[in-house]
């Protein structure tokens, strides 16, 4: 099973509070910061809510 590399490409400043909370819950604080998370339904659901702020790529283990 693959992992997902999630990179914040747009700032969370002046975004709705819920979008900021979601980005911080993923561990994304600054623009161009990246995290690796497992590819599952929960992670995909979180990404869907802030898809306009992040870039996602699949990474093999």
UniProtKB/Swiss-Prot annotation:
A cellular-component GO term for this protein: cytosolic large ribosomal subunit
Keywords from the named record: Ribonucleoprotein, Ribosomal protein
Gene3D superfamilies attached to this UniProt entry: Ribosomal protein L30, ferredoxin-like fold domain
Pfam families: Ribosomal_L30 (PF00327)
Cross-referenced InterPro entries: Ribo_uL30_ferredoxin-like_sf (IPR036919), Ribosomal_uL30_bac-type (IPR005996), Ribosomal_uL30_ferredoxin-like (IPR016082)
SUPFAM superfamilies referenced in this protein's UniProt entry, alphabetically: Ribosomal protein L30p/L7e
Molecular function as annotated in GO: structural constituent of ribosome
The keyword Cytoplasm is annotated on this UniProt entry: no
Complex and partners: Part of the 50S ribosomal subunit.
Entry protein name: Large ribosomal subunit protein uL30
Lineage of producing organism: Bacteria, Bacillati, Bacillota, Bacilli, Lactobacillales
